[in-house]
Amino acid sequence: MEKFKEIMDANQMRRALVRISHEILEKNKGVENLCLVGIQRRGVTLAKRIQENIEMIEGVKLPLGILDITFYRDDLSLLSEHPTVNSTRIDFDINNKKIVLVDDVIFTGRTVRAAIEALMDMGRPKMIQFAVLIDRGHRELPIRADYVGKNVPTSRKEIVHVLVDEFDNDNRVIIEQLDREI
């Protein structure tokens, strides 16, 4: 069996993000009070792409925030003695705003739970929605994405990697086969 398998190429990624952008606009009836927040790291890249798509469609550049959830994780003590902390930058008031959280992959649901908790510590949004490029299943919490690029059934012996130019000099999604469960 192959160790890596491509499940989405650059064009498929682009089309999925364009579709998600249209779905966000449709569900929210436009851009009023709408803001995007990308979850560090690859969620930020995908949020920027959605922001660009919406700007091309509506002619409006949505506010975009960057969220690091490191200290909100329920597995922080298991990660490392010195976890890598990225920046959080949300330069707009989130109170009474419709926030679309963006991430690359949803697996157990724990990352988005932490992101929601972090947002709630910053204010009281009118609504929080969740957009994700890949939903791989295996939820451990009662959380689902509002916008999904692709549902990809996986086993616990697989890892989904979303590759983006900004970090990987590539745009595609691959599944890596492991020898053990995660």
Swiss-Prot record:
Q: Which InterPro entries match?
A: PRibTrfase_dom, PRTase-like, PyrR, PyrR_bifunctional
Q: Where is this motif: PRPP-binding?
A: 99-111
Q: Which CDD domains match?
A: PRTases_typeI (cd06223)
Q: Name the Enzyme Commission number(s) assigned to this protein.
A: 2.4.2.9
UniProt entry tagged with the keyword Transcription: yes
GO molecular function terms attached to this record: RNA binding; uracil phosphoribosyltransferase activity
Pfam families, per database record: Pribosyltran
Q: Which Gene3D superfamilies match?
A: 3.40.50.2020
**Which purpose does this protein serve, as stated in its record?**
Regulates transcriptional attenuation of the pyrimidine nucleotide (pyr) operon by binding in a uridine-dependent manner to specific sites on pyr mRNA. This disrupts an antiterminator hairpin in the RNA and favors formation of a downstream transcription terminator, leading to a reduced expression of downstream genes. Also displays a weak uracil phosphoribosyltransferase activity which is not physiologically significant.
Concerning its family, UniProt says: Belongs to the purine/pyrimidine phosphoribosyltransferase family. PyrR subfamily.
Name listed for the protein in its UniProt record: Bifunctional protein PyrR
Species of the source:
Caldicellulosiruptor saccharolyticus (strain ATCC 43494 / DSM 8903 / Tp8T 6331)
User: In the UniProt record, what gene is named as encoding this protein?
Assistant: pyrR
